[in-house]
Amino acid sequence: MNTRFFARTAALTAFALAPSLASAHTGLGHVDGFAHGFTHPLGGLDHVLAMVMVGLFASQLGGRARWLVPASFVSVMVLGGMLGLAGIAIPFVELGIGLSIVVLGGVVAFNLQAGVAAAMALVGFFAVFHGYAHGAEMPESASGLAYGLGFVLATAALHAAGLGCGLLLDGKESAKGALFVRSLGAVAAIAGVGVVSGLV
């Protein structure tokens, strides 16, 4: 598949999903639940950084990983969200979220060329913690289905943004572009250390 076409498609997906946030504020009930779910991943720097890093990681791996890695994150995140909604406790949620930024930022910074299965397993592991946090923090008045749809779409949009950014820079076939992507990973990893240490 043409890299430039794929990059534009990913970027357009992110922008296409964004208006859903505005329209979600036009009502209450199920729609209000969607709004809460959509804004939850966008309201925390930890979630935003990790989601974008997943997209950048997928862009660096190329091939099938471009869609399998983000898809595996979203799929496992849904399972984590169900655990959170059910009130089933899992340990070290906040630590897991913080470490996800450090690790995912690190693999982007070092341009780690992992196998597709290993990459899916890595992002899937951290997806449990992010999903759990989304589910556990759902407002009591919100519809579980609408809320879940909201945070799934927001997460997918952030993945698409990272993927599109990575592919657009890679499409320039520039060493500077690749270095910039790796620099973004390094910045995210440093921010993740701040999250884990409680400084951010």
What kind of feature is each model-predicted range?
Residues 2-200:
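Membrane metalloprotein/metal-transporter helix-bundle signature
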